[in-house]
Each structure stands twice: as C-alpha cells, then as structure tokens.
Curated annotation (Swiss-Prot):
<feature type="binding site">
    <location>
        <position position="329"/>
    </location>
    <ligand>
        <name>ATP</name>
    </ligand>
</feature>
<feature type="binding site">
    <location>
        <begin position="355"/>
        <end position="358"/>
    </location>
    <ligand>
        <name>ATP</name>
    </ligand>
</feature>
<keyword id="KW-0808">Transferase</keyword>
<dbReference type="GO" id="GO:0005829">
    <property type="term" value="C:cytosol"/>
</dbReference>
<dbReference type="GO" id="GO:0004618">
    <property type="term" value="F:phosphoglycerate kinase activity"/>
</dbReference>
<comment type="similarity">
    <text>Belongs to the phosphoglycerate kinase family.</text>
</comment>
<dbReference type="GO" id="GO:0006096">
    <property type="term" value="P:glycolytic process"/>
</dbReference>
<comment type="subunit">
    <text>Monomer.</text>
</comment>
<dbReference type="InterPro" id="IPR015824">
    <property type="entry name" value="Phosphoglycerate_kinase_N"/>
</dbReference>
<feature type="binding site">
    <location>
        <position position="38"/>
    </location>
    <ligand>
        <name>substrate</name>
    </ligand>
</feature>
<comment type="pathway">
    <text>Carbohydrate degradation; glycolysis; pyruvate from D-glyceraldehyde 3-phosphate: step 2/5.</text>
</comment>
<dbReference type="InterPro" id="IPR001576">
    <property type="entry name" value="Phosphoglycerate_kinase"/>
</dbReference>
<keyword id="KW-0418">Kinase</keyword>
<protein>
    <recommendedName>
        <fullName>Phosphoglycerate kinase</fullName>
        <ecNumber>2.7.2.3</ecNumber>
    </recommendedName>
</protein>
<dbReference type="GO" id="GO:0005524">
    <property type="term" value="F:ATP binding"/>
</dbReference>
<feature type="binding site">
    <location>
        <position position="118"/>
    </location>
    <ligand>
        <name>substrate</name>
    </ligand>
</feature>
<keyword id="KW-0963">Cytoplasm</keyword>
Length: 407
C-alpha cells in the first residue's frame, strides 16, 4: 500500500482541507471537554501546513447523534487556538453557504475549523470511496480546495465521506499523526524485529481474541501475555477451575461461547501465556491465589505472573501493550499493569501502547522517549489494524496515490 505523506506532496500557498480527529470525552453534567490530548496531537500537522503558506480548513466529528457527547466544536476551536498559539476561526456550519463563503474569503496562512461533520447526515453512511466522492459534502467542498490531508488515524476504520470521499477528487496525503501511527504499527509486521511480545488485557474479549487469532495465523507473535478477561477466558479454555464467581463474570460479559476458539488456539501450540496466579479481594483484603485455586472474583494478575511476563519483556525487540492486567480503577489492582508498563519502558525494545486505560497510566511515569515509545491515538482503528482488517481511510489514500496524483 502506497500512502503519500506531506513530504511527497509539497502543499504550499494553497487551501487545504485537513480531516483530523478531535473527538474527545465530554463531561455529561457540564458539557466541557475532559481531555485535549487528541487536539494537541494534530498541532504538528497544522503548524507545518500553515508554515508553508497554506490556508488550513479543519474538519472533524464529535460523538454520534443521540449520545451525550454529540456537540458542536466551538470549545474544540478554543483549545486548538491555545495549543497552536494562533487564531482559529470557528465556523458554525459544515458545507452550507456560510461555510463556503468563509472558506472562499479566508487568507492563506490562517486556520478555520468547520463544525461537527456528523451534523451532516451523509457522514453517518458507510459506503465506498467512489460513492462518497459523489456525495453532496464532497461535491460542495471539493472545488474550494487544492489538496486534502487525512490526519485522523483514530477514525481510519470508518468508510465515511470526510474520510474516503475527498482522496478520489483531490491530491491527498496522510498527515503527521497518520504517518507516525502507520510507521509505528508497521514494525509489528516487519521481519527481523523479533522477538515480538504482545500484552493483551482489558475487558474487550472478542476484540482481543480476534487480534490473537490474526497474530497466530500470521506468525507475528513470539509471546502473547494475557491479563484481564481474556486471560480468564484462556484459563477456562485450558481447563483451570476459576470457580463459579468468575464463570459468572465471563457469562455476564457474554464471552463463554468463545472458549472453543481459545481452546483451539491453545491446542495449536499458539504462544499464549496464561497467568499462574491472580489477585482477589475477600473481606476488604487483597490476596494472591494460584490460578488453579481461585476462591473469589479475579481483580488482577499476581506477582509471580508479573515476574514471568517481565522476563519475556526484557528480551523483546517489539512490545505491544493493549489493555490493563486488572481493575485499574481501584488503586490496589493497578500495580501489575504499572510494573509491566515500567519494565517495557526500561527494556531495549520499541514499545507501542494503545487503549485509554494504559495511556492514562503513562501520565504518572514521566517523559517518554519518542524514539522508543509510540502512544497510539487509535481505538477501533488500532484494534482492526492489529487484527489484520482493512482500514478504508488508508485504502482511499492509496487509491489517490495511484489514480489522482498520476493525472
């Protein structure tokens, strides 16, 4: 796949439409944004385009219709202005007469943010790049621009108009966020970067299982270290008796039906490591119990497991950590995840961290060496990338490179 970057397309003194992803958590009571990390992530791309004399028009979404976080982007524009240290004009329109008039009249070297693109019903439709290239959104905005940049890796798994329609009608490239994500994650699939260790935790069992199946099928993983609910699923698949309480947890999560798939992986010789001990809570006290003698609801992996997992991490060249080992909302069950994260950072290997819970743990660890660590902005896109699924936004940029840039 050929994904053009800003180095390949030297946009200058032009008007450029930039798809970013500044979808952020919103306080349900106040309506205020709770985190601006995604907003800060796009500053590099925007500044670079502005420094080349371009007029930069930003388009993004926030939430989905019917959800509490489905809002306009006015507050986002203020935060963008703060982090860019320059004026960002907010336009309370997406493709109507007012938006088009503001784009036509904007000065080169300035930045304009359109309103929530999901206010446009077409944006909610999943369709092919060709179909979206004929949408009203694309047809109305395309004549106003000389180029398009997609910097929204976190939404790359969506096949929506603002993500896949414009590359078919405009010279298009990836932005710096998109470029860094693809470059970092490509290391997962590169030969000669062994051993590769994947640390899979959290509560999204089906997603984790799909990723593990793809890693095993493509022989990409030397070790897969499990924690969270996916570890419990594999423990049951191995025949360990986790007790009635933990079976009920898996049943309530609707994942007991996945046990045969996990068992098939184990029987195939897949390099899946299962915890040898767990932390449980009884009467307000925390205890560590062997994996085959668990007497209460599992809250975390045990210290012996952390020691075993750390030995694999020390020798790894690539480490991918997705999801916590335990219930990290409770400080008592945060240590295993924090220790494995700390050991990964101290290892000589390259670390890729994904998932909101793991990223939140990074905050208390200190400054990160960007040459050794990549913090992924992708949620669903990261999962699908690791599971070997297609990412429509990347495919659209590839089509643009083959069909639009050569015209």
């Amino acid at each position: 796949m050929n994904i053009p970057t800003l180095d390949d397309l030297n946009f200058s003194n032009s008007k450029v439409l930039v798809r970013i992803d500044i979808n952020s958590p919103v306080d349900s009571k106040t309506g205020k944004l709770l985190d601006d990390s995604r907003i800060k992530a796009h500053v590099e791309t925007i500044r670079e385009l502005v420094s080349r004399g371009n007029g930069v028009v930003l388009v993004s979404h926030q939430g989905r219709p019917g959800d509490n976080d489905f809002t306009d982007l006015e507050e986002h524009s203020r935060l963008l202005q703060k982090h860019l240290d320059m004026e960002v004009e907010f336009v309370g329109d997406v493709m109507g007469p007012y938006a088009r008039e503001r784009i036509r009249n904007m000065k080169l070297g300035s930045v304009l943010l359109l309103d929530n693109v999901r206010f446009v019903s077409e944006e909610l439709i999943e369709a092919s790049p060709l179909q979206h290239s004929r949408s009203f959104l694309v047809r109305r905005l395309q004549p106003l621009f000389q180029g398009y940049v997609n910097d929204a890796f976190a939404t790359a798994h969506r096949s929506q108009a603002s993500l896949v329609g414009f590359p078919l009608v405009l010279r298009s490239s990836a932005g710096r966020v998109m470029e860094k994500e693809v470059s970092a994650l490509a290391k997962v699939f590169n030969e000669g970067e062994e051993p590769k260790v994947f640390i899979m935790g959290g509560g999204k069992v089906l997603d984790s299982l799909r990723i593990i199946e793809n890693l095993v099928k493509r022989r990409l993983a030397d070790r897969i270290l499990t924690g969270g609910l996916i570890a419990e699923l594999f423990a049951v698949a191995k025949g360990l008796d986790l007790g009635k309480d933990n079976l009920q947890v898996l049943e309530k999560a609707g994942v007991l039906s996945l046990v045969p798939r996990a068992r098939k992986l184990l029987l195939s010789g897949a390099p899946v490591e299962i915890p040898v001990d767990f932390k449980v809570e009884k009467g307000g006290q925390v205890y560590e119990e062997p994996a085959n003698k668990v007497t209460a609801v599992i809250k975390d992996v045990g210290s012996t497991t952390v020691g075993i997992y750390s030995s694999f991490i020390r020798d790894a060249k690539i480490i991918v950590m997705r999801g916590p080992m335990g219930v990290i909302e409770d400080e008592r069950f945060r240590e295993s995840s924090r220790t494995l994260l700390k050991n990964s950072l101290e290892s000589p290997g390259y670390l890729i961290v994904g998932g909101g819970h793991m990223i939140s743990l990074l905050g208390g660890i200190g400054p990160l060496d960007s040459s050794k660590v990549h913090v992924s902005t992708g949620g669903g896109a990261l999962l699908l990338f690791l599971a070997g699924e297609r990412l429509p936004a990347l495919e659209a940029l590839d089509i643009s490179a083959r069909e639009v840039l050569k015209k």
